[in-house]
Amino acid sequence: MDREQLREIQSRRLVKMAEYVYHNTPFYRKKFQEMGLEPGDIKSIDDIVKLPFTNKLDLRDNYPFGLAAVPMSQIVRIHASSGTTGKPVVVLYTRKDLAMWAEAISRAFTAYGAGKEDIFQVAYGYGLFTGGLGAHDGATNIGASVIPISSGNTQKQMTLMHDFGTTILCCTPSYAMFLGEAMKECEWPREDFKLKIGVFGAEPWTEKMRVKLEESLGIKAYDIYGLSEVAGPGVGYECQCQNGTHLNEDYFYPEILDPNTGEPLPEGTFVELTFTHLTKEGMPLLRYRTHDLTALHYEKCECGRTLVRMDRILGRCDDMLIIRGVNVFPSQIEDVILKLREISRSEERRVGKECRS
């Protein structure tokens, strides 16, 4: 599909979404009225700049179901964040939403070269966290076998990985680093494992970390991007060219904005990423501010896909440190640490009164 055709789809869906949220979500109807905006004012994707922003505080202020656009009788799944810094952020899915999400993750898995002959070991956490069930549904959607082991119990992870012939591992990159160390120490040589692909997400990781993961596990390591508020894993994914993260922009429309002014900025500028749902029924969000810092690129990828590509997430607006006038992100510190061959894993710890909650 060329960019012009994609833009036509995005325009049709945005026009429909503006009508949908106005008539089904009191929160957005009030926002529209305060701005003097009518659904009919949205005529194409170019008009997205007229729509109001949404942020995490809006979700918490409307906890638990204040942003629902359908009756709870139509909601078939509820996910939520841990709520470590306040009320949990609740996300609602209809049956159609789950099918869309599974399709989005399926695109990622097929881009990595996965198929129905593969055995997925899903070591993301299951439960309120979106990672486990999201990866599970995406794998079953392409007809693959799934080991729903969830996270933890490393010895059992290694045993099942060996005995069941796992070919694809899904987990956080930090846990994958731990599994890589465990593989060195387990009773079987690495050659006895059938692992070939790692799908890593739910936390930022660097190219240096990719190299270490591929060396320790004997795999090709791929990034998968997502956030619970938008859908979960599968919002974006790498292809085999690994030249950026393709965003499923027919479902989730991305913008890059100045984090201070909220103004859109040109392609290639490293700024804040926002998403607008184009098809979601249960709890659609308009211009949701992720606070993730990245850049977008619209030229066609070598793989043939025309979906926009996103640079690796540099960090979050609220994670940035200013050290002697220089902007520094945790990912940059990790990149330096991982250059030391003596270090296989690292973690961030915050100490001090201001970190207590």
Where are these regions (language model features)?
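Glycine-rich helix-loop-beta junction characteristic of Rossmann-like nucleotide cofactor-binding loops
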Residues: 110-114, 138, 189-190
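Phosphate-coordination loops involved in phosphoryl transfer and adenosine-cofactor binding
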Residues: 116-117, 195
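Short glycine- and Lys/Arg-enriched binding-loop motifs that mark or flank ligand-binding interfaces
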Residues: 79-82, 121-123, 127, 222, ...
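AMP-binding/adenylate-forming
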Residues: 94-108, 119-178
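Active-site glycine/GP-rich loop and adjacent strand/helix microenvironment
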Residues: 1-5, 12-22, 26, 142-357
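Nucleotide 5′-phosphate-binding alpha/beta core
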Residues: 1-80, 85-103, 107-111, 115
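Short, solvent-exposed beta-strand edge segments and adjacent coil->beta transition regions
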Residues: 88, 117, 318-320
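Beta-strand-connecting loops/turns
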Residues: 117-118, 268
